[in-house]
Protein backbone atom coordinates (compact mmCIF):
# COMPACT_ATOMS: atom_id res chain seq x y z
CA UNK A 1 0.00 0.00 0.00
CA UNK A 2 1.30 3.45 -0.98
CA UNK A 3 0.22 6.26 1.35
CA UNK A 4 1.34 9.83 0.89
CA UNK A 5 1.07 13.01 -1.10
CA UNK A 6 1.40 13.15 -4.87
CA UNK A 7 4.92 14.47 -4.46
CA UNK A 8 6.02 11.77 -2.02
CA UNK A 9 4.59 9.03 -4.24
CA UNK A 10 6.28 10.48 -7.33
CA UNK A 11 9.59 10.82 -5.49
CA UNK A 12 9.36 7.19 -4.43
CA UNK A 13 8.72 6.11 -8.02
CA UNK A 14 11.71 8.15 -9.20
CA UNK A 15 14.05 6.71 -6.57
CA UNK A 16 12.91 3.13 -7.26
CA UNK A 17 13.55 3.56 -11.01
CA UNK A 18 16.31 6.18 -11.03
CA UNK A 19 18.17 4.50 -13.91
CA UNK A 20 15.25 5.27 -16.24
CA UNK A 21 14.96 8.96 -15.32
CA UNK A 22 16.88 11.97 -16.61
CA UNK A 23 18.54 12.30 -13.20
CA UNK A 24 21.83 10.90 -11.97
CA UNK A 25 22.76 9.44 -8.61
CA UNK A 26 22.95 11.87 -5.69
CA UNK A 27 20.59 14.38 -7.30
CA UNK A 28 19.56 17.27 -5.07
CA UNK A 29 15.97 18.37 -4.49
CA UNK A 30 15.46 22.13 -4.25
CA UNK A 31 13.13 23.78 -1.78
CA UNK A 32 11.52 27.12 -2.68
CA UNK A 33 14.46 29.22 -1.50
CA UNK A 34 17.04 26.94 -3.13
CA UNK A 35 15.15 27.22 -6.39
CA UNK A 36 15.08 31.03 -6.30
CA UNK A 37 18.73 31.16 -5.25
CA UNK A 38 19.76 28.85 -8.11
CA UNK A 39 17.96 31.08 -10.62
CA UNK A 40 19.46 34.16 -8.94
CA UNK A 41 22.98 32.75 -9.35
CA UNK A 42 22.26 32.20 -13.07
CA UNK A 43 20.23 35.35 -13.72
CA UNK A 44 22.72 36.48 -16.40
CA UNK A 45 21.70 33.48 -18.52
CA UNK A 46 18.06 34.47 -18.38
CA UNK A 47 18.72 38.15 -19.03
CA UNK A 48 20.60 37.17 -22.20
CA UNK A 49 17.36 35.72 -23.66
CA UNK A 50 15.91 37.68 -26.55
CA UNK A 51 12.80 39.67 -25.49
CA UNK A 52 13.35 38.60 -21.87
CA UNK A 53 11.86 41.91 -20.71
CA UNK A 54 8.51 41.07 -22.35
CA UNK A 55 8.04 38.07 -20.05
CA UNK A 56 9.71 39.22 -16.82
CA UNK A 57 9.35 42.66 -15.25
CA UNK A 58 12.30 45.04 -15.07
CA UNK A 59 13.42 44.87 -11.43
CA UNK A 60 16.21 43.55 -9.23
CA UNK A 61 17.82 40.16 -9.82
CA UNK A 62 16.30 38.52 -6.74
CA UNK A 63 12.75 39.62 -7.58
CA UNK A 64 13.23 38.53 -11.16
CA UNK A 65 14.41 35.14 -9.89
CA UNK A 66 11.20 34.75 -7.89
CA UNK A 67 9.11 35.73 -10.91
CA UNK A 68 10.96 33.22 -13.11
CA UNK A 69 10.36 30.45 -10.56
CA UNK A 70 6.62 31.17 -10.56
CA UNK A 71 6.53 31.05 -14.36
CA UNK A 72 8.51 27.82 -14.77
CA UNK A 73 6.60 26.09 -11.98
CA UNK A 74 3.26 26.87 -13.61
CA UNK A 75 4.49 25.86 -17.06
CA UNK A 76 5.99 22.62 -15.75
CA UNK A 77 2.83 21.59 -13.93
CA UNK A 78 0.83 22.16 -17.11
CA UNK A 79 3.28 19.84 -18.95
CA UNK A 80 4.18 22.58 -21.42
CA UNK A 81 6.94 21.74 -23.92
CA UNK A 82 9.38 24.68 -24.18
CA UNK A 83 9.92 23.93 -27.89
CA UNK A 84 6.22 24.59 -28.57
CA UNK A 85 6.41 27.97 -26.85
CA UNK A 86 9.67 28.89 -28.58
CA UNK A 87 8.05 28.32 -31.98
CA UNK A 88 5.19 30.72 -31.22
CA UNK A 89 4.94 33.93 -33.27
CA UNK A 90 4.23 35.97 -30.14
CA UNK A 91 7.62 37.22 -28.88
CA UNK A 92 6.51 37.04 -25.25
CA UNK A 93 5.39 33.41 -25.59
CA UNK A 94 8.64 32.57 -27.38
CA UNK A 95 10.62 34.24 -24.58
CA UNK A 96 8.72 32.17 -22.01
CA UNK A 97 9.76 29.06 -23.91
CA UNK A 98 13.41 30.16 -23.83
CA UNK A 99 13.17 30.86 -20.10
CA UNK A 100 11.75 27.40 -19.46
CA UNK A 101 14.45 25.77 -21.60
CA UNK A 102 17.31 27.65 -19.88
CA UNK A 103 15.85 26.73 -16.51
CA UNK A 104 15.57 23.06 -17.44
CA UNK A 105 19.16 23.15 -18.74
CA UNK A 106 20.37 24.51 -15.39
CA UNK A 107 18.60 21.72 -13.53
CA UNK A 108 20.02 19.09 -15.87
CA UNK A 109 23.59 20.46 -15.75
CA UNK A 110 23.62 20.47 -11.95
CA UNK A 111 21.61 17.27 -11.36
CA UNK A 112 18.86 19.20 -9.59
CA UNK A 113 15.13 18.71 -9.23
CA UNK A 114 12.69 21.30 -7.93
CA UNK A 115 9.38 20.62 -6.20
CA UNK A 116 7.31 20.86 -9.41
CA UNK A 117 9.75 18.67 -11.31
CA UNK A 118 9.14 15.78 -8.90
CA UNK A 119 5.76 15.25 -10.55
CA UNK A 120 6.83 16.08 -14.10
CA UNK A 121 9.82 13.73 -13.92
CA UNK A 122 7.64 10.89 -12.63
CA UNK A 123 5.14 11.57 -15.42
CA UNK A 124 7.95 11.60 -18.01
CA UNK A 125 9.29 8.32 -16.64
CA UNK A 126 5.93 6.54 -16.74
CA UNK A 127 4.97 7.79 -20.21
CA UNK A 128 8.36 6.96 -21.75
CA UNK A 129 8.89 3.54 -20.17
CA UNK A 130 5.76 1.37 -20.57
CA UNK A 131 7.34 -1.51 -18.63
CA UNK A 132 7.78 0.68 -15.56
CA UNK A 133 4.18 1.89 -15.87
CA UNK A 134 2.93 -1.69 -16.26
CA UNK A 135 4.85 -2.75 -13.17
CA UNK A 136 3.34 0.13 -11.17
CA UNK A 137 -0.19 -0.63 -12.39
CA UNK A 138 0.21 -4.26 -11.39
CA UNK A 139 0.88 -3.09 -7.83
CA UNK A 140 -1.79 -0.38 -7.66
CA UNK A 141 -5.33 -1.69 -8.18
CA UNK A 142 -7.28 0.89 -6.20
CA UNK A 143 -6.68 4.63 -5.88
CA UNK A 144 -8.19 6.99 -3.31
CA UNK A 145 -7.52 10.74 -3.39
CA UNK A 146 -8.62 13.17 -0.70
CA UNK A 147 -9.13 16.93 -1.23
CA UNK A 148 -9.47 16.38 -4.96
CA UNK A 149 -10.64 19.96 -5.47
CA UNK A 150 -7.07 21.07 -4.67
CA UNK A 151 -5.38 19.02 -7.40
CA UNK A 152 -3.81 20.52 -10.52
CA UNK A 153 -3.52 19.44 -14.15
CA UNK A 154 -0.49 17.16 -13.86
CA UNK A 155 -1.93 15.46 -10.78
CA UNK A 156 -5.10 14.66 -12.71
CA UNK A 157 -2.95 13.17 -15.48
CA UNK A 158 -1.07 11.06 -12.93
CA UNK A 159 -4.30 9.76 -11.37
CA UNK A 160 -5.59 8.41 -14.67
CA UNK A 161 -2.13 7.16 -15.60
CA UNK A 162 -2.00 5.15 -12.37
CA UNK A 163 -5.62 4.02 -12.76
CA UNK A 164 -5.09 2.48 -16.19
CA UNK A 165 -7.72 0.03 -17.38
CA UNK A 166 -8.91 -0.81 -13.86
CA UNK A 167 -10.40 2.66 -13.36
CA UNK A 168 -10.83 1.87 -9.65
CA UNK A 169 -10.51 5.52 -8.69
CA UNK A 170 -12.28 7.15 -5.75
CA UNK A 171 -11.95 10.88 -5.21
CA UNK A 172 -13.32 12.88 -2.29
CA UNK A 173 -13.57 16.64 -2.20
CA UNK A 174 -15.69 19.74 -1.90
CA UNK A 175 -15.72 22.15 -4.80
CA UNK A 176 -16.71 24.94 -2.39
CA UNK A 177 -13.39 24.50 -0.56
CA UNK A 178 -11.09 25.03 -3.52
CA UNK A 179 -8.56 27.27 -1.77
CA UNK A 180 -5.40 26.63 -3.76
CA UNK A 181 -6.00 28.17 -7.15
CA UNK A 182 -3.04 30.48 -6.45
CA UNK A 183 -0.87 27.34 -6.44
CA UNK A 184 -2.21 26.05 -9.73
CA UNK A 185 -5.07 23.92 -8.38
CA UNK A 186 -8.30 23.81 -10.35
CA UNK A 187 -11.79 22.77 -9.21
CA UNK A 188 -12.35 21.72 -12.82
CA UNK A 189 -10.81 18.37 -11.84
CA UNK A 190 -13.58 17.51 -9.39
CA UNK A 191 -16.39 19.18 -11.32
CA UNK A 192 -15.58 17.28 -14.52
CA UNK A 193 -14.43 14.01 -12.94
CA UNK A 194 -17.61 12.04 -13.84
CA UNK A 195 -17.19 13.11 -17.48
CA UNK A 196 -13.91 11.17 -17.68
CA UNK A 197 -15.84 7.89 -17.73
CA UNK A 198 -18.47 6.28 -19.93
CA UNK A 199 -22.11 6.75 -18.95
CA UNK A 200 -22.97 4.80 -15.80
CA UNK A 201 -19.34 4.03 -14.90
CA UNK A 202 -18.84 6.75 -12.30
CA UNK A 203 -20.98 6.72 -9.18
CA UNK A 204 -21.42 10.05 -7.38
CA UNK A 205 -22.22 9.92 -3.66
CA UNK A 206 -23.23 13.32 -2.20
CA UNK A 207 -21.91 13.89 1.33
CA UNK A 208 -24.02 16.78 2.58
CA UNK A 209 -24.11 16.22 6.36
CA UNK A 210 -21.63 18.38 8.26
CA UNK A 211 -20.41 16.74 11.48
CA UNK A 212 -17.89 19.42 12.38
CA UNK A 213 -19.52 22.85 12.43
CA UNK A 214 -22.20 24.40 14.59
CA UNK A 215 -25.58 24.64 12.84
CA UNK A 216 -25.37 28.47 12.86
CA UNK A 217 -22.19 28.26 10.80
CA UNK A 218 -23.73 25.74 8.39
CA UNK A 219 -26.80 27.95 7.95
CA UNK A 220 -24.61 30.99 7.30
CA UNK A 221 -22.62 29.03 4.71
CA UNK A 222 -25.75 27.93 2.82
CA UNK A 223 -27.13 31.46 2.87
CA UNK A 224 -23.81 32.89 1.69
CA UNK A 225 -23.71 30.60 -1.35
CA UNK A 226 -27.24 31.75 -2.27
CA UNK A 227 -26.45 35.43 -1.63
CA UNK A 228 -23.37 35.45 -3.86
CA UNK A 229 -25.27 33.97 -6.80
CA UNK A 230 -27.03 36.59 -8.85
CA UNK A 231 -27.11 40.17 -10.04
CA UNK A 232 -25.94 41.68 -6.76
CA UNK A 233 -22.53 40.01 -7.09
CA UNK A 234 -22.65 39.93 -10.91
CA UNK A 235 -21.88 36.24 -10.80
CA UNK A 236 -23.57 32.88 -11.37
CA UNK A 237 -22.24 29.70 -9.81
CA UNK A 238 -23.77 27.38 -12.43
CA UNK A 239 -20.92 25.23 -13.76
CA UNK A 240 -18.48 26.39 -11.06
CA UNK A 241 -19.94 24.21 -8.29
CA UNK A 242 -22.16 21.21 -7.67
CA UNK A 243 -25.57 22.38 -6.48
CA UNK A 244 -26.05 21.28 -2.86
CA UNK A 245 -27.40 22.30 0.53
CA UNK A 246 -25.33 21.29 3.55
CA UNK A 247 -27.16 19.93 6.61
CA UNK A 248 -25.86 20.16 10.19
CA UNK A 249 -25.50 16.87 12.04
CA UNK A 250 -27.53 18.20 14.94
CA UNK A 251 -28.98 21.36 16.39
CA UNK A 252 -27.25 22.57 19.58
CA UNK A 253 -29.19 22.35 22.83
CA UNK A 254 -27.95 25.80 23.84
CA UNK A 255 -29.60 28.84 22.32
CA UNK A 256 -26.57 31.11 22.77
CA UNK A 257 -24.72 32.13 19.59
CA UNK A 258 -21.72 30.12 18.46
CA UNK A 259 -20.02 33.25 17.16
CA UNK A 260 -19.29 36.38 19.19
CA UNK A 261 -17.58 39.62 18.21
CA UNK A 262 -14.43 40.77 19.98
CA UNK A 263 -13.15 44.07 18.63
CA UNK A 264 -11.93 47.59 19.33
CA UNK A 265 -12.13 50.85 17.44
CA UNK A 266 -8.76 51.09 15.68
CA UNK A 267 -6.90 51.06 19.00
CA UNK A 268 -4.15 48.45 18.86
CA UNK A 269 -3.40 48.55 22.58
CA UNK A 270 -7.07 48.12 23.45
CA UNK A 271 -7.29 45.24 20.95
CA UNK A 272 -4.34 43.52 22.62
CA UNK A 273 -5.81 43.99 26.09
CA UNK A 274 -9.26 42.71 25.06
CA UNK A 275 -7.80 39.55 23.56
CA UNK A 276 -5.66 38.96 26.64
CA UNK A 277 -8.67 39.49 28.91
CA UNK A 278 -10.75 37.15 26.73
CA UNK A 279 -8.18 34.35 27.06
CA UNK A 280 -7.68 34.93 30.78
CA UNK A 281 -11.45 34.92 31.29
CA UNK A 282 -11.76 31.55 29.58
CA UNK A 283 -9.01 30.16 31.82
CA UNK A 284 -10.48 31.51 35.06
CA UNK A 285 -13.96 30.20 34.18
CA UNK A 286 -12.59 26.72 33.55
CA UNK A 287 -13.72 26.69 29.92
CA UNK A 288 -10.10 26.58 28.82
CA UNK A 289 -7.81 23.94 30.32
CA UNK A 290 -4.92 24.27 27.85
CA UNK A 291 -3.91 27.18 25.64
CA UNK A 292 -3.72 24.79 22.68
CA UNK A 293 -7.54 24.73 22.64
CA UNK A 294 -7.49 28.19 21.02
CA UNK A 295 -6.57 28.98 17.42
CA UNK A 296 -6.23 32.47 15.93
CA UNK A 297 -6.81 32.63 12.18
CA UNK A 298 -5.37 35.43 10.03
CA UNK A 299 -5.03 36.29 6.36
CA UNK A 300 -1.30 36.36 7.02
CA UNK A 301 0.64 35.48 10.18
CA UNK A 302 3.52 37.61 8.86
CA UNK A 303 1.62 40.90 9.09
CA UNK A 304 3.09 43.39 11.54
CA UNK A 305 -0.10 43.70 13.58
CA UNK A 306 -0.17 39.90 13.98
CA UNK A 307 3.46 39.61 15.07
CA UNK A 308 2.89 42.50 17.51
CA UNK A 309 -0.04 40.63 19.03
CA UNK A 310 2.11 37.49 19.33
CA UNK A 311 4.84 39.41 21.14
CA UNK A 312 2.26 41.03 23.44
CA UNK A 313 0.74 37.68 24.42
CA UNK A 314 4.17 36.11 24.99
CA UNK A 315 5.19 39.06 27.17
CA UNK A 316 2.11 38.30 29.27
CA UNK A 317 2.94 34.64 29.76
CA UNK A 318 0.93 33.15 26.88
CA UNK A 319 3.14 31.22 24.47
CA UNK A 320 2.33 31.51 20.77
CA UNK A 321 2.97 28.72 18.28
CA UNK A 322 3.26 30.30 14.85
CA UNK A 323 6.02 28.54 12.91
CA UNK A 324 5.20 30.25 9.61
CA UNK A 325 5.20 33.81 10.91
CA UNK A 326 8.76 34.35 9.64
CA UNK A 327 9.93 35.47 13.09
CA UNK A 328 12.89 33.08 12.90
CA UNK A 329 15.45 35.87 12.57
CA UNK A 330 13.92 37.74 15.52
CA UNK A 331 14.34 34.85 17.95
CA UNK A 332 16.95 35.75 20.62
CA UNK A 333 19.04 32.61 20.06
CA UNK A 334 19.34 33.38 16.32
CA UNK A 335 20.19 37.04 16.89
CA UNK A 336 22.86 35.98 19.39
CA UNK A 337 24.45 33.44 17.01
CA UNK A 338 24.59 35.99 14.18
CA UNK A 339 25.98 38.70 16.46
CA UNK A 340 28.68 36.43 17.90
CA UNK A 341 29.61 35.18 14.44
CA UNK A 342 30.02 38.74 13.17
CA UNK A 343 32.20 39.73 16.13
CA UNK A 344 34.70 37.08 15.07
CA UNK A 345 35.25 38.98 11.80
CA UNK A 346 36.30 42.53 12.81
CA UNK A 347 36.90 43.66 9.23
CA UNK A 348 33.31 42.83 8.33
CA UNK A 349 32.04 44.69 11.41
CA UNK A 350 34.12 47.73 10.39
CA UNK A 351 32.45 47.71 6.99
CA UNK A 352 29.07 47.45 8.68
CA UNK A 353 29.84 50.43 10.91
CA UNK A 354 30.99 52.46 7.89
CA UNK A 355 27.98 51.39 5.79
CA UNK A 356 30.24 50.10 3.02
CA UNK A 357 27.86 47.40 1.80
CA UNK A 358 25.71 48.74 -1.02
CA UNK A 359 23.36 45.73 -1.13
CA UNK A 360 22.22 46.18 2.47
CA UNK A 361 19.23 48.42 3.11
CA UNK A 362 18.78 50.52 6.28
CA UNK A 363 16.60 47.70 7.65
CA UNK A 364 19.41 45.18 7.18
CA UNK A 365 21.92 47.51 8.82
CA UNK A 366 19.58 47.97 11.80
CA UNK A 367 19.05 44.25 12.14
CA UNK A 368 22.74 43.30 11.98
CA UNK A 369 23.74 46.09 14.36
CA UNK A 370 21.01 44.92 16.71
CA UNK A 371 22.43 41.39 16.61
CA UNK A 372 25.88 42.73 17.49
CA UNK A 373 24.42 44.81 20.34
CA UNK A 374 22.63 41.71 21.68
CA UNK A 375 25.88 39.75 21.52
CA UNK A 376 27.92 42.48 23.24
CA UNK A 377 25.29 42.82 25.96
CA UNK A 378 25.40 39.08 26.65
CA UNK A 379 29.19 38.89 26.54
CA UNK A 380 29.51 41.80 29.00
CA UNK A 381 28.17 39.56 31.76
CA UNK A 382 31.09 38.32 33.91
CA UNK A 383 29.67 34.80 33.70
CA UNK A 384 30.24 34.90 29.92
CA UNK A 385 33.93 35.84 30.29
CA UNK A 386 35.25 32.57 28.82
CA UNK A 387 32.97 32.87 25.80
CA UNK A 388 33.91 36.55 25.40
CA UNK A 389 37.64 35.80 25.50
CA UNK A 390 37.24 32.98 22.98
CA UNK A 391 35.43 35.28 20.53
CA UNK A 392 38.12 37.95 20.94
CA UNK A 393 40.86 35.41 20.21
CA UNK A 394 39.04 34.21 17.11
CA UNK A 395 38.48 37.77 15.94
CA UNK A 396 42.17 38.61 16.37
CA UNK A 397 43.16 35.44 14.50
CA UNK A 398 40.83 36.12 11.56
CA UNK A 399 41.86 39.80 11.36
CA UNK A 400 45.50 38.87 10.80
CA UNK A 401 44.96 35.45 9.22
CA UNK A 402 48.17 34.13 7.61
CA UNK A 403 47.22 30.59 6.64
CA UNK A 404 44.01 28.68 5.98
CA UNK A 405 42.10 27.39 8.99
CA UNK A 406 40.82 23.84 9.31
CA UNK A 407 37.22 25.06 9.76
CA UNK A 408 34.64 27.17 7.98
CA UNK A 409 31.68 29.24 9.21
CA UNK A 410 29.67 26.21 10.30
CA UNK A 411 32.73 24.94 12.18
CA UNK A 412 32.90 28.20 14.12
CA UNK A 413 29.25 27.89 15.05
CA UNK A 414 29.71 24.34 16.29
CA UNK A 415 32.65 25.53 18.42
CA UNK A 416 30.40 28.22 19.91
CA UNK A 417 28.09 25.50 21.21
CA UNK A 418 30.68 24.68 23.88
CA UNK A 419 29.66 27.87 25.68
CA UNK A 420 26.53 29.00 27.47
CA UNK A 421 23.77 29.83 26.53
CA UNK A 422 24.05 27.50 23.53
CA UNK A 423 25.32 24.55 25.56
CA UNK A 424 22.35 24.97 27.92
CA UNK A 425 19.85 25.23 25.06
CA UNK A 426 21.21 22.18 23.26
CA UNK A 427 21.21 20.07 26.42
CA UNK A 428 17.44 20.51 26.85
CA UNK A 429 15.60 17.21 27.29
CA UNK A 430 13.68 16.24 24.15
CA UNK A 431 10.46 15.43 26.02
CA UNK A 432 9.84 18.83 27.61
CA UNK A 433 7.44 20.12 24.97
CA UNK A 434 7.74 21.96 21.69
CA UNK A 435 7.92 25.49 23.10
CA UNK A 436 10.91 24.73 25.32
CA UNK A 437 12.56 22.94 22.40
CA UNK A 438 12.03 25.82 19.99
CA UNK A 439 15.44 27.48 20.61
CA UNK A 440 17.24 24.17 20.06
CA UNK A 441 15.23 23.48 16.90
CA UNK A 442 15.91 26.98 15.59
CA UNK A 443 19.65 26.63 16.23
CA UNK A 444 19.61 23.32 14.35
CA UNK A 445 17.86 25.02 11.42
CA UNK A 446 20.43 27.84 11.41
CA UNK A 447 23.32 25.38 11.21
CA UNK A 448 21.55 23.74 8.25
CA UNK A 449 21.30 27.15 6.57
CA UNK A 450 25.03 27.84 7.01
CA UNK A 451 25.97 24.31 5.93
CA UNK A 452 23.92 24.73 2.76
CA UNK A 453 25.53 28.11 2.09
CA UNK A 454 29.01 26.57 2.37
CA UNK A 455 27.97 23.72 0.07
CA UNK A 456 26.56 26.04 -2.60
CA UNK A 457 29.60 28.32 -2.51
CA UNK A 458 32.16 25.53 -2.05
CA UNK A 459 33.54 26.96 1.19
CA UNK A 460 35.15 24.60 3.69
CA UNK A 461 37.91 26.73 5.27
CA UNK A 462 38.75 30.38 5.95
CA UNK A 463 41.36 31.25 3.34
CA UNK A 464 43.67 34.33 3.60
CA UNK A 465 44.85 34.00 -0.03
CA UNK A 466 44.46 37.16 -2.12
CA UNK A 467 42.05 37.19 -5.06
CA UNK A 468 41.44 40.31 -7.16
CA UNK A 469 43.18 42.46 -4.57
CA UNK A 470 41.26 41.21 -1.52
CA UNK A 471 41.60 38.33 0.91
CA UNK A 472 39.22 35.48 0.16
CA UNK A 473 38.21 35.30 3.82
CA UNK A 474 36.97 38.90 3.65
CA UNK A 475 35.10 38.35 0.37
CA UNK A 476 33.59 35.10 1.57
CA UNK A 477 32.50 36.59 4.90
CA UNK A 478 30.52 39.30 3.15
CA UNK A 479 28.60 36.75 1.07
CA UNK A 480 26.65 34.97 3.84
CA UNK A 481 25.66 38.21 5.57
CA UNK A 482 25.20 40.54 2.59
CA UNK A 483 23.63 38.02 0.24
CA UNK A 484 22.54 34.61 1.51
CA UNK A 485 21.20 35.50 4.97
CA UNK A 486 19.92 38.84 3.67
CA UNK A 487 17.77 37.09 1.06
CA UNK A 488 16.50 34.60 3.64
CA UNK A 489 15.72 37.50 5.98
CA UNK A 490 13.79 39.30 3.23
CA UNK A 491 11.91 36.22 2.09
CA UNK A 492 11.21 34.88 5.55
CA UNK A 493 12.04 31.51 7.02
CA UNK A 494 9.70 29.35 9.08
CA UNK A 495 10.58 28.02 12.48
CA UNK A 496 10.60 24.31 13.23
CA UNK A 497 7.14 22.81 12.74
CA UNK A 498 6.22 19.45 14.23
CA UNK A 499 3.79 17.67 11.89
CA UNK A 500 2.98 15.15 14.61
CA UNK A 501 1.74 17.85 17.00
CA UNK A 502 -0.11 20.62 15.20
CA UNK A 503 -1.32 22.23 18.45
CA UNK A 504 1.44 21.83 21.05
CA UNK A 505 0.39 21.96 24.68
CA UNK A 506 0.75 25.31 26.41
CA UNK A 507 0.51 27.43 23.25
CA UNK A 508 -2.18 29.32 21.43
CA UNK A 509 -1.87 28.69 17.69
CA UNK A 510 -1.52 31.51 15.16
CA UNK A 511 -2.47 30.13 11.73
CA UNK A 512 -3.45 31.32 8.29
CA UNK A 513 -6.91 30.31 7.11
CA UNK A 514 -5.27 28.01 4.53
CA UNK A 515 -3.01 26.49 7.16
CA UNK A 516 -5.91 25.68 9.49
CA UNK A 517 -7.83 23.65 6.93
CA UNK A 518 -8.66 20.22 8.31
CA UNK A 519 -7.75 21.12 11.89
CA UNK A 520 -10.20 21.33 14.77
CA UNK A 521 -10.10 23.63 17.80
CA UNK A 522 -12.76 24.17 20.50
CA UNK A 523 -12.30 27.94 20.31
CA UNK A 524 -11.41 29.84 17.13
CA UNK A 525 -10.69 33.57 16.92
CA UNK A 526 -10.84 34.98 13.38
CA UNK A 527 -9.09 38.24 12.61
CA UNK A 528 -10.82 40.94 10.60
CA UNK A 529 -10.81 40.33 6.85
CA UNK A 530 -10.88 44.08 6.29
CA UNK A 531 -13.17 45.06 3.45
CA UNK A 532 -13.19 41.63 1.76
CA UNK A 533 -15.18 39.72 0.71
CA UNK A 534 -17.30 42.64 -0.44
Per-segment meaning from a language model:
Residues 196-199, 257-259, 284-437, 447:
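ATPase/helicase motor core of nucleic-acid motors
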Amino acid sequence: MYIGTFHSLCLRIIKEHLEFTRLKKNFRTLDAFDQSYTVFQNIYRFRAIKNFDTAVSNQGAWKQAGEICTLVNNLSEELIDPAVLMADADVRIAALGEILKVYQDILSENNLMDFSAIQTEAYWLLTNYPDVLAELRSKIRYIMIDEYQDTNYIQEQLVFLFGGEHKNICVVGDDDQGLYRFRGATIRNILEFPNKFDAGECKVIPLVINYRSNSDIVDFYNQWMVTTDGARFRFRWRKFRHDKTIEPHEKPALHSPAVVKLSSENDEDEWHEKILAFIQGLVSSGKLTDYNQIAFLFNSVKHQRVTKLARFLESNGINVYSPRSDMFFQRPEIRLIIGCLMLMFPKYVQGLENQEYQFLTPEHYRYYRGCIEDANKYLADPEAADFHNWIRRRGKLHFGLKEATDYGYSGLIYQMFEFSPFSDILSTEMNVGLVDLRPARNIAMFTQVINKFEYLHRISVLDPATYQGRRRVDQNTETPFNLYLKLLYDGGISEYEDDAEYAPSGCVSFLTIHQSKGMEFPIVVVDSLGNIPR
